Amino acid sequence: MQRTNKRYPIGSHLVVYHFGYSHHGIYAGRGRVIHYSGFAHLFKKKPIEITTLSQFSHGKKIHVRHYEHARYKGRIVVRRMRSRMHENHYHLILNNCEHLCSWAI
């Protein structure tokens, strides 16, 4: 099982690779990740939520997606993610966890 006690900069775009798909979230600080939980619950439609790093990663290695020209950074990214909390418009193709993170950054 992969340890998730590594520190990430606030506002980092985190990615976990699973068989056949990847899951994306934004690091919000204090070991928490904001993400669209659609894939996290086996394709069930769920809202944007805050979970721990270990809940987000399910024991998999966490990768950081780097942006050369990010429009927003740090706490502003987290604020943008929080502005969409409890949204429940997940769509595998049109509005997924990766789209949400890219929008926030």
Give the residues covered by each predicted segment.
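Cysteine-nucleophile amide-bond enzymes
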Residues: 1-105
